[in-house]
Every structure is written in C-alpha cells, then in structure tokens.
C-alpha cells in the first residue's frame, strides 16, 4: 500500500506524516514552539544489504509507509517505499540510523523493552532491528505464507502477534518464533489491524475487511466478542460503501475506550471495553463532514482527529457525561493547527494516495449464472434435436406422410 497521511501521539509529542515528510511538535504548552521536520526523500540511500527477489536498489519516492513511537516515547521509527528503516531519538530529535530492509514494509512496532523494533513486510516476514546497535543488520524472526498487515507484541515481550491477508492472527513465542502458541481464527477477510489492550494485557482487539471488530483471549485463541459494524444501522450511510476495514484502532486507558476508524468513511466509532464481562459496548458515532485521515488518544486530553480540512485540520474530542463532544479550540490546538496549515502541501499531496484496503478483498466470480444459462441452452438444443428426429418426413404435397399400421419404411 502506498504512503498516506498519519497521526501519532506519545506523551506530549505529536507527529503528523504525509508523503515523504513528517513533522513533530509539542502539545504541552502553547509557548513551546519547538518543531522538527524530516524529509525522507533527502535521506541517505544505500545499496540494499538484505537482498531479496526485488531489485538491489529500490528507487522509491521516500513516501512513508508506517511509523510508530516506542512505549516511553524516547524513540520513533518509520519505513518508506525506498525500503528503509529510519530510527530517531526524540529527546531531542535526532536521526540515529538509516537501514535497508528486504521488502517494502506494512507495519512496525517496538518491543516493550525498547531494545528492538519489529518490522513486518508484504512478503509475510518479520525482521527485528536493534535499537541499542542502531546500525546493526536485521534478523529474520518469523514468516507467513501471506502478506502481513500488522504486528504487535505482548506487554511482557513474550509473544509476537501477527495479522495477515489470509484471515489469520498468529501468536508466536518471541524467544522461539517457530513455536506457535495459538491462532485467533474467525475473520472471513484480511485482518487489517490488531492491538493488545494495554489495561488487559491478555486481550487483543482486531478488525478485518469482513466488517467486524473482535475481542480475543489471544493465548488460547478464544474469541470473546464480535461486533458487526453493519448491524449498527444508524451508522450506515446508504450512499457509502458497505465494506468496513479498520485503518486505525486506538485505545484510551483512562476510560477503557476504543476508537475505530474505518477505511474510506468519515466516521469514528466509539466503543467501551467491559473488562468484567469481556465484551465491547458500542457508545457513539462521531460523524465528520471531511475525510478523516487518522485518530489518536492522548491520555490527559482525549481523542485527537486529523481530517482533510485546511481550516480545522485537528479536532479534539472529550467525553462529556455519556457523550463525546468536540472541545472549543484551545491555544495549544490553535498552535498545532497553525503548524499544519503552514505545511499543508505535504498533507494535501498525500490525500489521494492509494492506501486503502480495496485491493485486498477476495476476488469473487459469479460463474454459476453463466453456467446455468449455458446448461439451459444446451438442454433446449438437445430437446429440439430429439423432436426433429421423431417427426416423420413430409410427403409430395408438403404434408407429413401418413403410414399404415405395420408399414415399414424402406431404405436403399
């Protein structure tokens, strides 16, 4: 999938990416005008160290494919379409290394100890890269027979969780990735996103092209709850496509809330995790007039929404009673929105990038209708042929010749 616009929050640091660039700024105070901008297209390009089937040197544009913070926010990593993994230190911002990867990547995550970053690619492999040795080569950890779409780790770093195009979620032991603890099976389309619940480290959230949000006990592979998004009738726009694949699952520890953003819909779904009953409770739909690019929770402030609107690129939502409501623009929000407006070209240029999941759905072929039609035509032809054989030949006057009982036709 091509690069697209994205939002990431960790602590008081906000990152917005678009195309080959990202910008990082602080949301701690309106007086903090620190701003870090990085352009991957200007980063160093090396010959590929981990050569695979692809060309030795990929001439990509530098478009960012995936990015993430480490747990503490001390590190930030991204991958681009030039097959590079770029690692940053955030306090202060500094590029630590630029390393090559074997394939274009689809997702990445830091392990909880922040010693390694795991990178999943389109060929189904997961590589680990050292953070402590920022120039070290990658190590192959595990592989699928299908494209990987997301990767996560358990809070204790014991398990690596991977989601692929062929409907599977695999739970592997980190110390011995060839040893599989379980599979979480039940999705009927590609698994687009997975997220371990921070407040319940044994639970996993997943979403798929089948239009469901599911809750799992991942070590046993047991499904605890399944929510069909299409069943929430008030959410369905008759003019909108009826396919729901999550492009983002965000979790807010403070309220045990889940925000779900689906690909191609200007809607954010809000659920609440009932840990005692081990189920998801639908709370609210947040509808927008513009395309929503990404969402992220900030623990002390609420839900940040990045949208395709130059006048108001960022919107902040907080729960007020039982309903989520937009917050009047604060000085911090005004400051960050002003920064985005000043760099709007990088976002606007990436808005049309094909980062959707539409190409991942199973191809369906309706060959039954054509088969039945051809079968009916064939039977009709056979019936007409039999009728012609049974009809007696015509006489001299054009009428069928009548034969007497017992009279047989003579043939030469």
From Swiss-Prot:
Transmembrane segments: none annotated. GO terms for cellular component: chromosome; cytosol; nucleoplasm; nucleus; tRNA (m7G46) methyltransferase complex; tRNA methyltransferase complex. Coiled coil: none annotated. WD repeats lie at residues 3-40, 50-90, 94-131, 137-174, 180-218, 230-273, 319-373. Changing residue 170 to A: Reduced formation of N(7)-methylguanine in tRNAs. The keyword 4Fe-4S does not apply. Induction: Amplified and overexpressed in a number of cancers (at protein level). Changing residue 83 to A: Slightly reduced formation of N(7)-methylguanine in tRNAs. InterPro entries: Trm82, WD40/YVTN_repeat-like_dom_sf, WD40_repeat_dom_sf, WD40_rpt. It comes from the Eukaryota. GO terms for biological process: DNA damage response; tRNA (guanine-N7)-methylation; tRNA modification. SMART domains: WD40. The modification Phosphoserine is found at residues 391, 411. Disulfide bonds: none annotated. Changing residue 167 to A: Abolished formation of N(7)-methylguanine in tRNAs. Keywords: Acetylation, Chromosome, Disease variant, DNA damage, Epilepsy, Intellectual disability, Nucleus, Phosphoprotein, Repeat, tRNA processing, WD repeat. It is found in: Nucleus; Chromosome. Non-catalytic component of the METTL1-WDR4 complex, composed of METTL1 and WDR4. Interacts with FEN1; the interaction is direct. PANTHER family: TRNA (GUANINE-N(7)-)-METHYLTRANSFERASE NON-CATALYTIC SUBUNIT WDR4 (PTHR16288:SF0), WD40 REPEAT PROTEIN 4 (PTHR16288). It is linked to Galloway-Mowat syndrome 6: A form of Galloway-Mowat syndrome, a severe renal-neurological disease characterized by early-onset nephrotic syndrome associated with microcephaly, central nervous system abnormalities, developmental delays, and a propensity for seizures. Brain anomalies include gyration defects ranging from lissencephaly to pachygyria and polymicrogyria, and cerebellar hypoplasia. Most patients show facial dysmorphism characterized by a small, narrow forehead, large/floppy ears, deep-set eyes, hypertelorism and micrognathia. In the context of cancer, overexpression of the METTL1-WDR4 methyltransferase complex promotes cancer progression by driving oncogenic transformation. The METTL1-WDR4 methyltransferase complex drives oncogenesis by mediating the formation of N(7)-methylguanine at position 46 (m7G46) in some tRNAs, in particular Arg-TCT-4-1 (TRR-TCT4-1), leading to increased translation of mRNAs, including cell cycle regulators that are enriched in the corresponding AGA codon. Belongs to the WD repeat TRM82 family. This is tRNA (guanine-N(7)-)-methyltransferase non-catalytic subunit WDR4. The lineage of its organism: Eukaryota, Metazoa, Chordata, Craniata, Vertebrata. The gene is WDR4.
């Amino acid at each position: 999938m091509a690069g697209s616009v994205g939002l990431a929050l960790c602590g008081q640091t906000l990152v917005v990416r678009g195309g080959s660039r990202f910008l990082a700024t602080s949301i701690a105070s309106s007086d903090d005008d620190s701003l870090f901008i990085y352009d991957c297209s200007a980063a160093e390009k090396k010959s590929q160290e981990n050569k695979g089937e692809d060309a030795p040197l990929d001439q990509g544009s530098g478009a960012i494919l995936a990015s993430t913070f480490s747990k503490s926010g001390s590190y930030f990593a991204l991958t681009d379409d030039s097959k590079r993994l770029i690692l940053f230190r955030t306090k202060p911002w500094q590029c630590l290394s630029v390393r090559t990867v074997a394939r274009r990547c689809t997702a990445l995550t830091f392990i909880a100890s922040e010693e390694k970053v795991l990178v999943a690619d389109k060929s189904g492999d997961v590589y680990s890269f050292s953070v402590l040795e920022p120039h070290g080569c990658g190590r192959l950890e595990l592989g699928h027979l299908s494209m990987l779409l997301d990767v996560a780790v358990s809070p204790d770093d014991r398990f690596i969780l991977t989601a692929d195009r062929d409907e599977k979620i695999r739970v592997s032991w980190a110390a011995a990735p060839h040893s599989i603890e379980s599979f979480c099976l039940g999705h009927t389309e590609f698994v687009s996103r997975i997220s371990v619940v921070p407040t319940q480290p044994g639970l996993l959230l997943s979403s798929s092209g089948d239009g469901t949000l599911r809750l799992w006990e991942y070590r046993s592979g047991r499904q605890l709850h399944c929510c069909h998004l299409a069943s929430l009738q008030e959410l369905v726009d008759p003019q909108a496509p009826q396919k729901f694949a999550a492009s983002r699952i965000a979790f807010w520890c403070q309220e045990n809330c889940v925000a779900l953003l689906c690909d191609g819909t200007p809607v954010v779904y809000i659920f609440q995790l009932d840990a005692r009953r081990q189920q998801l409770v639908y709370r609210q739909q947040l509808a927008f007039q513009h395309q929503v690019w990404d969402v992220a929770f900030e623990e002390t402030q609420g839900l940040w929404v990045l949208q395709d609107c130059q006048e108001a690129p960022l919107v902040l939502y907080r729960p007020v009673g039982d309903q989520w409501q937009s917050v009047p623009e604060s000085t911090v929000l005004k400051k960050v929105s002003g920064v985005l407006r000043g760099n709007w070209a990088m976002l606007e240029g990436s808005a049309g990038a094909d980062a959707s999941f539409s190409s991942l759905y199973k191809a369906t072929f309706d060959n039954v209708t054509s088969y039945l039609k051809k079968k009916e035509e064939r039977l009709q032809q056979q019936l007409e042929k039999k009728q012609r054989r049974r009809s007696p030949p015509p006489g001299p006057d054009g009428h069928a010749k009548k034969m007497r009982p017992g009279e047989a036709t003579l043939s030469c």
